[in-house]
Amino acid sequence: MIRILVLCSGNAARSQIAEGLFRAHGQGTVEIHSAGTQPAGFVHPLAIRTMLERGIDISQQKSKSLRYYENQRFDYVITVCDDAQLECPLFPGAYEQLHWSTPDPSFFPGPESEQLDAFRRTIDSLSSHILRLLEQLKNKKAASQ
């Protein structure tokens, strides 16, 4: 099984959304984890709410520190914020590192309706990246058989 770690700074919104999307779209083909370089200690309520709109429940996910994963092996390490890309440590073994620069929706100013739209845009953006990667993985697997 392909092991993937998604990193952002707080592990409260973007990487949590990505973890939930990988679980939903990967349908058991990937082992997905997320972490933060400076974990917030919670999953953002608007991330939970907007993912539920898509039928994906991330309410039981936990905000985790990158340190928990430091000596583990992954096939892919994906950073979804520029700070995490700069702070991303080296992991053991061979892996592919991807960077999907994604603005933090939790910093979007304005009324809640506009904040919700920012979270929805984040979900759409990450979903596009994730579906593309999953398709590439599927094609690689088919080509190797």
Question: Positions of the model-derived regions?
Answer:
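Residues at the C-termini of beta-strands that transition into short coil/loop
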Residues: 36, 81, 101-103
